[in-house]
């Protein structure tokens, strides 16, 4: 039966793969994030889903990285969840918006201190000329922030992917897969139109 709300279906599948992941230790929050620069060069990488709701899918990143710069140039992105161990996949197309600063601050403060310091020291996606210098900088910053709260760098932000299209794929016998595609109504963001696609 096709559900009217794709977030409800996502939640159902996510909890299914989460139960399996408790046994096989594979991270169900891993998702491929595809971005595209203003000169139409695509790139993709794996990031981690931190939360989701009717408002969208949240992850955190360094906006000075390649993906950050590309999202600043072109806010249209795509996500893919490959949940092969339950024979399912979810594909999402949407646009990004920034998570409020206080939400980013709250999540940043919950991270291990080593990860917080790493966010200050890593010039993500830039050429690393000397790894020893990088390690030394981490040591210096560790001393600087010893027994002090570590503030969130301005460039380290939360991103919400607001879905405009969601496709759910389920493996079938003899490659007769099941595919449901949900698209948001352009006149009513609370309304989704759903169709079944050929495999």
Curated annotation (Swiss-Prot):
Keyword field contains Electron transport: no
Catalysed reactions, semicolon-separated: pyridoxamine 5'-phosphate + O2 + H2O = pyridoxal 5'-phosphate + H2O2 + NH4(+); pyridoxine 5'-phosphate + O2 = pyridoxal 5'-phosphate + H2O2
Residues that hold substrate according to the record: 50, 107, 111, 115, 175-177
Cofactor note: Binds 1 FMN per subunit.
Record keywords, A-Z: Flavoprotein, FMN, Oxidoreductase, Pyridoxine biosynthesis
Superkingdom per UniProt: Bacteria
GO terms classed as biological process: pyridoxine biosynthetic process
GO MF annotation list: FMN binding; pyridoxamine phosphate oxidase activity
Keyword Ribonucleoprotein: no
EC number(s) on file: 1.4.3.5
Assembly and binders: Homodimer.
HAMAP family named among the record's database cross-references: PdxH
PANTHER family named in the record: PYRIDOXINE-5'-PHOSPHATE OXIDASE, PYRIDOXINE-5-PHOSPHATE OXIDASE
Function per UniProt: Catalyzes the oxidation of either pyridoxine 5'-phosphate (PNP) or pyridoxamine 5'-phosphate (PMP) into pyridoxal 5'-phosphate (PLP).
Protein name, entry field: Pyridoxine/pyridoxamine 5'-phosphate oxidase
Organism: Ehrlichia chaffeensis (strain ATCC CRL-10679 / Arkansas)
Gene name, Swiss-Prot/TrEMBL: pdxH
């Amino acid at each position: 039966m096709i559900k009217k709300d794709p977030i409800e279906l996502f939640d159902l599948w996510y909890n299914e793969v989460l139960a399996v992941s408790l046994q096989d230790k594979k991270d169900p929050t891993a998702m491929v994030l595809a971005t595209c620069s203003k000169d139409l060069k695509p790139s993709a990488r794996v990031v981690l889903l931190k939360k989701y709701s009717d408002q969208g899918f949240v992850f955190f990143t360094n906006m000075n990285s390649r993906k950050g710069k590309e999202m600043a140039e072109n806010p249209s992105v795509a996500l893919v969840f490959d949940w092969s161990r339950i024979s399912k996949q979810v594909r999402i197309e949407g646009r990004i918006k920034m998570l409020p600063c206080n939400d980013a601050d709250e999540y940043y403060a919950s991270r291990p201190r080593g990860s917080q310091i790493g966010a200050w020291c890593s010039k993500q996606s830039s050429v690393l000329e000397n790894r020893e210098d990088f390690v030394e900088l981490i040591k210096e910053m560790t001393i600087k922030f010893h027994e002090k709260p570590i503030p969130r760098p301005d460039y380290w932000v939360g991103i919400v992917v607001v879905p405009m299209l969601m496709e759910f794929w389920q493996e079938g016998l003899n490659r007769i897969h099941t595919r449901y595609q949900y698209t948001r109504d352009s006149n009513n963001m609370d309304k989704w139109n759903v169709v079944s696609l050929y495999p």
